[in-house]
From Swiss-Prot:
Disulfide bonds join C8-C39, C18-C29. A motif (Cx9C motif 2) lies at residues 29-39. It is found in: Mitochondrion intermembrane space. A motif (Cx9C motif 1) lies at residues 8-18. Keywords: Disulfide bond, Mitochondrion, Repeat. The gene is CMC4. Belongs to the CMC4 family. It holds the Pfam family CMC4. InterPro entries: CMC4, Cys_alpha_HP_mot_SF. The keyword Isomerase does not apply. The twin Cx9C motifs are involved in the recognition by the mitochondrial disulfide relay system. This is Cx9C motif-containing protein 4, mitochondrial. It comes from Zygosaccharomyces rouxii (strain ATCC 2623 / CBS 732 / NBRC 1130 / NCYC 568 / NRRL Y-229). GO terms for cellular component: mitochondrial intermembrane space.
Length: 74
């Protein structure tokens, strides 16, 4: 049986690649981080916050992080 790729893994990997490429300067990877958080938000909406993926913070922490970054939905 084929293993399924965890939700939002490409976005999580993009953050790792960005950090590596930018000498671990997180401020240069804001877009990649925002993309991951948006992906995670979509994932949790689709699973009624019951889905599990190693690539995303828990739903409560995700909401906090999105609010801090001004990414909350209107």
């Amino acid at each position: 049986m084929a293993q399924q790729t965890p939700s939002c893994k490409p976005q999580a990997c993009a953050i790792q690649n960005c950090l590596f490429s930018n000498n671990y300067n997180e401020s240069r990877c804001d877009q990649a981080i925002n993309d991951l958080y948006r992906c995670c938000e979509k994932f949790y909406k689709e699973t009624n916050s019951k889905g599990v993926t190693p690539c995303c913070p828990k739903p409560d922490l995700l909401r906090t992080k999105m609010t801090q970054r001004g990414l909350q939905e209107e």
